[in-house]
């Protein structure tokens, strides 16, 4: 329910949008979002959510979460004239949708493609990094500012969704 999760954009978007911002480090120009409530009346989350992040360089990234679509869409896709990156769901999570890291396929202008290897993580890496930060002051890979900006992008997407997908400029911080 939206009262608990913040809605479909917040529920599913936090990790996906963070992954997108790690792939495209450009400044964000604006965000547009849409929520559709069509079928599942027992829950207050949108049945379908669509977020497009437009960067100042003209690049765009799109995140779609749908509990309606007959075919599962990629987690996200970044399309360009020189190539594209498709972030697909990991089938290891089947039959349910699991928030495993996306399988990244890089598509080149010449029509070739390759799956980008994921960096292996040691078990409990997040917790180890917290201990390292507390005990030794070693910065964590994910910092509060990065997380704060992802939340600001989701807030802008929700605001846009309330205004029929009119683009909204998120309030982001650099430091």
Regions found by a protein language model. Give the residues of each.
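Predominantly a Rossmann-like dinucleotide-binding segment in NAD(P)-dependent oxidoreductases
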Residues: 1-42, 164
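A general structural signal for well-ordered alpha-helical segments in protein cores
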Residues: 16-17, 101, 123-131, 154
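Phosphate/oxyanion-binding loops and surfaces in catalytic or ligand/nucleic-acid-binding neighborhoods
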Residues: 23-26, 81-85, 157-161
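Active-site rim elements
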Residues: 5-8, 114-118, 136-141
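Short beta-strand scaffold segments in enzyme catalytic cores
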Residues: 51-53
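A generic structural signal for residues located within well-ordered alpha-helices
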Residues: 12-15, 122, 145-149
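C-terminal helix-rich "cap/oligomerization" subdomain common to oxidoreductases
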Residues: 56, 131-175
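NAD(P)-dinucleotide binding in Rossmann-like oxidoreductases
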Residues: 37, 41-46, 56-126, 143, ...
């Amino acid at each position: 329910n939206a009262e608990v999760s913040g809605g479909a954009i917040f529920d599913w978007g936090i990790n996906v949008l963070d992954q997108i911002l790690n792939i495209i480090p450009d400044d964000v120009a604006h965000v547009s979002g849409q929520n559709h409530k069509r079928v599942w009346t027992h829950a207050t989350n949108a049945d379908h959510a669509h977020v497009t992040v437009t960067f100042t360089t003209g690049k765009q990234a799109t995140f779609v979460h749908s509990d309606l679509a007959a075919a599962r869409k990629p987690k996200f896709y970044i399309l360009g004239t020189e190539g594209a990156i498709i972030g697909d769901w990991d089938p290891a999570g089947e039959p349910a949708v699991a928030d495993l890291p996306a399988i990244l396929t890089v598509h080149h202008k010449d029509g070739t493609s390759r799956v980008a290897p994921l960096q292996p993580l040691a078990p409990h890496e997040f917790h180890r990094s917290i201990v390292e930060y507390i005990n030794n002051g070693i910065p964590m890979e994910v910092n509060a500012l990065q997380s704060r900006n992802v939340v600001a992008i989701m807030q802008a997407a929700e605001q846009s969704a309330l205004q029929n997908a009119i683009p909204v400029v998120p309030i982001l911080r650099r430091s």
